């Protein structure tokens, strides 16, 4: 069963560039006395980051729409970077206050994303100042994104460029695979694939350079582009965290493809979930909202997964990857969750408490026994838009974990000669599983981090632009 609902919310080296960005930061950093003895609260941190992300979206829309970029928007990025790297942050560990205690979280992803964006924008604005009457696409072609991102590769700059060349050739073969004038399909996971992992799901925010490149790539080279993520659409979810236009050429899903944002509406696939299960999850979600505004538990809004309301479950972060939460507090929080489950489901026949990992637990609604995975999500969106994975045409699936393999398997079943796969990360067992599904090595690609594919996408767009001039 499918239901529709309106949305309820809405060539300078990299090192030289880094010094330039740092010089700008020195001009806007507050003095030590400005933040002495003041710890940012969890809510203040989230508010700061969401306000900054709004500025990112404005910049992305300006670039895509060939409009002016306001200096105030760039200044907001700089102010945010200065704030989150002030004296309360040491080695990317930021100390914050909760209602009754202190919390230390890792903000490396948030800080690095902002730094790379500032380097990207500096080059873009410098190019614009020398070519004031030129539109953004030709100016973007003058920005060597690979030279900015290479310094942040997890292994080495040399490895970055090796993977970059391989990925660029791979994407060329995908983009040039038009069959009878029919562009290919692009389907991707999000976290760890198109976006670096972040210690806090609630502030796992997409940078500008990534949003601009992905949107242009989807529009220029594909007939269907879709993001499938395990997280929700809202609350926060992918629609809150992305910097891409949510009603643009890239479609967004949450809950493994159970919920989609299509035509300005949330489309939900309820297969196997009872009405009482939905109702119980909704009431528990309300209970969790109240719990997070009480005493020690407020910090759990920013611990790992936070509180994610998915179609068939709640996913709750109970510990950070660095073990910053006291075990006793984590256990008390989980007990408080169970107590609220009992309020909602006193007979214990609707909701199931699943301590899935050391970092998060899940509260799952009983279902009819059907096991939903991302392959089901792919099928639903492809059929909804009246398309097919079948030949003719290529289908590129991108992922970074074993949970993404069902998408590859589905595409390989429907289109064995046209399926392609790009996987991110260093897990050799996962890579071997991909090789078994796609035996033609020209139709698979392995890279170490998302920035490699963003640099390759940007360069491919530049090549196509230059070839038409």
Positions of the model-derived regions?
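Short, glycine-anchored, charge-dense loop/turn motifs used at functional sites
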Residues: 189-195, 263-267
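Short, surface-exposed amphipathic charged segments that create phosphate/polyanion-binding patches used
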Residues: 263-274, 369, 460-468
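Phosphate/oxyanion-binding active-site loops and adjacent basic polyanion-contact surfaces
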Residues: 203-207, 277-284, 369-378, 402-404, ...
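A short acidic (Asp/Glu
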Residues: 198, 236-241, 318-319, 405-411, ...
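Active-site phosphate-binding/coordination module
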Residues: 205-306, 310
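Conserved acidic, metal-coordinating active-site core of Asp-based
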Residues: 301-303, 308-396, 402-412, 417
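Acidic, Mg2+-coordinating phosphoryl-transfer loop and its flanking beta/alpha structural elements
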Residues: 229, 396-456
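Non-catalytic pre-domain segments flanking phosphatase-related domains
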Residues: 2-190, 198-202
């Amino acid at each position: 069963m499918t239901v529709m609902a309106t949305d309820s919310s809405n060539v300078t080296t990299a090192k030289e560039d880094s010094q330039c960005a740092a010089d700008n930061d020195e001009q806007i950093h507050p003095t030590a006395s400005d933040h002495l003895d003041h710890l940012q609260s969890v809510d203040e941190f989230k508010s700061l980051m969401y306000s900054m992300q709004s500025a990112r979206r404005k910049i992305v829309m300006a670039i895509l729409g060939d409009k002016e970029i306001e200096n105030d928007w760039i200044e907001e990025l700089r102010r945010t970077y200065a704030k989150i790297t002030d004296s309360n942050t040491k080695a990317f560990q930021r100390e914050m206050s909760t209602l009754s205690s202190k919390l230390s979280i890792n903000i490396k992803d948030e800080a690095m994303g902002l730094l790379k964006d500032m380097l990207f924008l500096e080059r873009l604005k410098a190019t614009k100042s020398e070519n004031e009457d030129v539109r953004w696409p030709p100016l973007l072609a003058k920005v060597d994104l690979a030279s900015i991102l290479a310094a942040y590769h997890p292994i080495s700059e040399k490895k970055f460029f090796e993977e970059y060349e391989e990925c660029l050739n791979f994407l060329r073969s995908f983009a040039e695979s038009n069959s009878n004038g029919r562009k290919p399909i692009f389907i991707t996971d999000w976290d760890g694939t198109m976006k670096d992992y972040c210690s806090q799901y609630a502030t796992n925010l997409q940078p500008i350079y990534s949003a601009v490149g992905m949107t242009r790539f989807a529009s220029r080279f594909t007939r269907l582009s879709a993001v499938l993520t395990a997280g929700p659409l809202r609350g926060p979810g992918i629609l809150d965290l992305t910097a891409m236009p949510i009603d643009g050429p890239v479609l967004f899903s949450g809950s493994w493809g159970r919920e989609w944002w299509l035509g300005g509406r949330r489309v939900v696939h309820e297969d196997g979930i009872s009405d009482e299960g939905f109702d119980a999850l909704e009431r528990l979600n309300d209970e969790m909202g109240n719990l997070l505004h009480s005493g020690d538990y407020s910090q759990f809004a920013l611990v790992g997964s936070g509180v994610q309301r998915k179609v068939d479950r709640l996913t709750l972060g109970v510990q950070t990857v660095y073990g910053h939460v006291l075990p006793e507090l984590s256990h008390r929080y989980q007990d408080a969750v169970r107590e609220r489950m009992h309020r909602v489901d006193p007979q214990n026949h609707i909701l199931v408490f699943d301590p899935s990992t050391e970092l998060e637990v899940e509260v799952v609604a009983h279902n009819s026994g059907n096991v939903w995975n991302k392959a089901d999500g792919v099928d639903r969106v492809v059929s909804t838009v009246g398309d097919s994975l079948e030949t003719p045409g290529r289908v590129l699936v991108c992922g970074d974990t074993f949970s993404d393999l069902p998408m590859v398997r589905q595409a390989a079943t429907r289109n064995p000669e046209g399926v392609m796969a790009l996987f991110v990360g260093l897990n050799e067992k996962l890579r071997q599983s991909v090789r078994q599904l796609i035996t033609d090595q020209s139709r698979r690609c392995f890279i170490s981090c998302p920035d490699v594919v963003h640099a390759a996408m940007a360069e491919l767009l530049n090549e196509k632009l230059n070839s038409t001039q």
